[in-house]
């Protein structure tokens, strides 16, 4: 929940995908090799554009040249689970990028308190 919330607050029109990837919440080292393929994706059948992967050390594993734009609909996603563990948590919220930030479109709260 914390990483979805943290990553969502970074996004605004004009932010590049590379800037987002550099500032995004970092997965714990013992979970990194088990991460979901992307941190951000568009809406569709399966991880549509924009597709922002968890970056490798030199950012060679994806195209980070895009820019967040007003009226873009995105999903902020996370999976955290240790490698070889039986359990983990996969969370996702959908947002509309607006002039002054994001409007949450998903209605289910991820807060367990």
Where are each of the predicted segments found?
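Active-site neighborhoods and metal-handling regions in enzymes and metal-associated proteins
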Residues: 1-113
């Amino acid at each position: 929940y914390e990483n979805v919330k943290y990553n969502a607050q970074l996004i605004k029109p004009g932010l590049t995908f590379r800037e987002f990837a550099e500032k995004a919440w970092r997965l714990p080292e013992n979970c990194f090799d088990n991460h979901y393929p992307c941190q951000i994706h568009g809406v569709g059948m399966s991880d549509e554009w924009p597709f922002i992967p968890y970056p490798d050390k030199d950012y060679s594993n994806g195209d980070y040249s895009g820019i967040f734009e007003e009226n873009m609909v995105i999903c902020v996603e996370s999976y955290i689970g240790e490698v070889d563990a039986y359990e983990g948590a996969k969370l996702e919220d959908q947002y509309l990028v607006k002039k002054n930030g994001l409007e949450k479109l998903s209605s289910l709260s991820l807060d367990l308190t």
